């Protein structure tokens, strides 16, 4: 279980670079003051309120941002699922990728993780080629896990596939830096 947690938290770090929305100056200030939950509590709550209002008004980048910040920055994983799901269904690839991580590692919802990676694989552009490749590989692996569920536990299969794909890409990233 320790290796799975390491892989999960390592992916959280990588995923922190994928959110594409342009925040306002106020949002940037609040984000910095919040400091991933280690700073001013009032800044965290105000930022979540602003982004939640954007999400509620149909701004899918706002949904993606509030889902990401709540889940990956502040550890409010269950609360982050609804805005991530909403923005994923609207085609925000980063949200689909992040939702897939939660569904595999935390919730065991392999069917939704598969659907999320189908969207992420289709929607990531060449600008985010590494995330596109990972998403497409995860889509294929999860499809296999779901089809072959008579012989194995789909959740264990998905977590193993996720760990393998993460490790493969992480090793490739390190070897290209040397």
Residue ranges and their predicted role:
Residues 41-46, 72-83, 108-116:
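Structural signature of tandem alpha-helical TPR/SEL1-like repeats
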Residues 37-40, 58-60, 73, 90-93, ...:
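Short helix-capping/linker turns of helical repeat alpha-solenoids
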Residues 18-49:
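N-terminal leader/linker segments that initiate helical-solenoid repeat arrays
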Residues 130-178:
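Terminal, low-structured helical/coil segments at or just beyond the last alpha-helical repeat
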Residues 111-126, 159-166:
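TPR/TPR-like (Sel1-like) alpha-helical repeat modules
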């Amino acid at each position: 279980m320790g290796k799975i947690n390491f892989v999960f938290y390592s992916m959280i770090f990588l995923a922190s670079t994928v959110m594409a929305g342009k925040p306002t100056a106020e949002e940037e200030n609040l984000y910095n003051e919040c400091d991933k939950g280690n700073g001013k509590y009032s800044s965290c709550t105000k930022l979540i309120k602003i982004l939640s209002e954007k999400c509620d008004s149909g701004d899918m980048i706002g949904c993606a941002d509030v889902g990401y910040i709540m889940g990956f920055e502040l550890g409010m994983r269950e609360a982050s699922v609804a805005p991530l799901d909403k923005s994923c269904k609207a085609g925000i690839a980063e949200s689909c990728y992040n939702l897939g991580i939660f569904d595999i590692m935390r919730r065991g919802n392999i069917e939704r993780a598969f659907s999320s990676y189908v969207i992420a694989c289709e929607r990531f552009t060449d600008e985010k080629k590494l995330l596109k490749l990972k998403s497409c590989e995860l889509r294929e692996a999860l499809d296999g896990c779901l089809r072959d569920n008579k012989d194995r536990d789909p959740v264990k299969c998905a977590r193993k596939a996720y760990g393998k794909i993460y490790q493969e890409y992480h090793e490739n990233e390190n070897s290209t830096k040397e």
